[in-house]
Amino acid sequence: MANVVVTGEQLDKSIREVVRILEDAVGCTAGPKGLTVAIGKSYGAPEVTKDGYKVIKSIKPEDPLALAIANIITQSASQCNDKVGDGTTTCSILTAKVIEEVSKAKAAGADIVCIKEGVLKAKEAVLEALMSMKREVLSEEEIAQVATISANGDKNIGSKIAQCVQEVGKDGVITVEESKGFKELDVEKTDGMQFDRGYLSPYFVTNSEKMLVEFENPYILLTEKKLNIIQPILPILENVARSGRPLLIIAEDVEGEALSTLVLNKLRGGLHVAAVKAPGFGDRRKDMLGDIAILTGAKHVISDDLAIKMEDLTLAELGTAKNIRITKDTTTIIGSVDNSSANVQSRINQIKMQIEASTSDYDKEKLRERLAKLSGGVAVLKVGGSSEVEVKERKDRVEDALHATRAAVEEGVVPGGGAALLYTLSVLENLKSKNDDEQLGINIVKRALQAPIKRIIKNSGSENAPCVIAHLLKQNDKELIFNVDTMNFANAFTSGVIDPLKVVRIAFDFAVSLAAVFMTLNAIVVDVPSKDDANAGAGGMGGMGGMGGF
């Protein structure tokens, strides 16, 4: 491999081309009338989706320079997706427009540093203006509206998510699973719990696309101890491996030889295992492990106070659950054992009595947290369909809608369909600039703010975006939107065309910040196959042209 430094016009041209290709692929999914994208795979049927993040992540150009640029954009999209689980499409549309306009200004000889200052100054003003537009989400109907919009107008998805929120509360645990049946969408309330601890190694991941650990019918080992060596749990590991079921270990910590051995067993396929730290600290950790034991039917939480040793545990003494879902930050236990309901209720009553007896506000607060986790349960959205392609596409939309709903509950909502960004134009009219080039940066953001609504209208098959934008700005009503489903103007909140503030805010913030990175990017160093690499590849293939350096 050889290093090549790409600079100047060649770099600018490549950035424009890659951004345009990504925006074309992702932008077509925007809005309720957006189109789907088929993502080809090395095996099996292509995946059909409207998930902008999945689309952008799947684009891997062969050209090393284009790939480097695409990777920078994908990394930013990934951060946006991690923050709110939605907004990638809006982020891509905004980024593409800012970069397009900056390229024109650069070609005209403008000072790029001053342009960047203007763009960043405008960004802060827009973010402040967005905050002033928000409205809290209070009713079940409003929750359904947010979910429906994010699910591309699917009212069934919206109503089911609202039902889940009603079942488990606004702070409750809601998960999405694929169903074995043909029913499009169903809601199931079950016992369960979520706590803020993620997997101790990414090598435990079973779903690499979403970086999740997903187990069905696992055994659960609970201990207050720190596991440094593998010897104490070897008998358990051997018994679990023979059973063919997965194992989740919840301990004070798992490190050193114990962690490396578990990872090695997982990678070799001998044992489906994952480890997480126990929630809480001190006595609170002890209590929460006790709660998990009650929920999962575990007979023991191994500790120094307990006479029974870890190596003496049988499979019947371990906890179990229907499903386990672990991210890098959280662990969700879904579905308790069949005979645990009475024990769970008894534990709930015990915690309630402790709350009444406690004289400490701090202790009461922590007890209420435990009560909420144990009594709230888990709402499971089961997604079905007549084919695998249909199920996966619907599941993507359900997950996007769920992320959007959580964001809306957290920070409130703003007028949807790109209208909120459009209405921030007014604050930029009065924004003072130091010079003409800084003003040029502010004007670039002005044009970018119109890009999402233009794309949504274009995807509906209409060419009337300029007229729609002019009418919205003329009315001086920041709750007015254009509904592409009815092709009419309406009030955002009465018609339900609303977006979570958090999604709009973060998508805009990330888009402008990413564009700012490209503004002052003067060179990219990429690896390209050298002639020697090509010859070496060809030499081993007996006249078949080599393997292109692989």
UniProtKB/Swiss-Prot annotation:
Q: Which domain of life is it from?
A: Bacteria
Task: Provide the GO MF annotations for this entry.
Answer: ATP binding; ATP-dependent protein folding chaperone; isomerase activity; unfolded protein binding
* Reaction catalyzed: ATP + H2O + a folded polypeptide = ADP + phosphate + an unfolded polypeptide
Location in the cell reads:
Cytoplasm
- The EC number of this protein is 5.6.1.7
GO CC aspect terms: cytoplasm
Query: Where, by residue number, does ATP bind?
Result: T29, A30, G31, P32, K50, D86, G87, T88, T89, T90, G417, D499
Q: Which UniProt keywords apply?
A: ATP-binding, Chaperone, Cytoplasm, Isomerase, Nucleotide-binding
Instruction: Give the enzyme's main class according to its UniProt record, as a single word.
Output: isomerase
Question: Which Gene3D superfamilies does the annotation name?
Answer: GroEL (3.50.7.10), GroEL-like equatorial domain (1.10.560.10), TCP-1-like chaperonin intermediate domain (3.30.260.10)
- One BP annotation, GO: protein refolding
Chain's role: Together with its co-chaperonin GroES, plays an essential role in assisting protein folding. The GroEL-GroES system forms a nano-cage that allows encapsulation of the non-native substrate proteins and provides a physical environment optimized to promote and accelerate protein folding.
Q: Which family does it belong to?
A: Belongs to the chaperonin (HSP60) family.
Q: How does it assemble?
A: Forms a cylinder of 14 subunits composed of two heptameric rings stacked back-to-back. Interacts with the co-chaperonin GroES.
**What is the name listed in the Swiss-Prot or TrEMBL entry for this protein?**
Chaperonin GroEL
Q: Which organism is it from?
A: Ehrlichia chaffeensis (strain ATCC CRL-10679 / Arkansas)
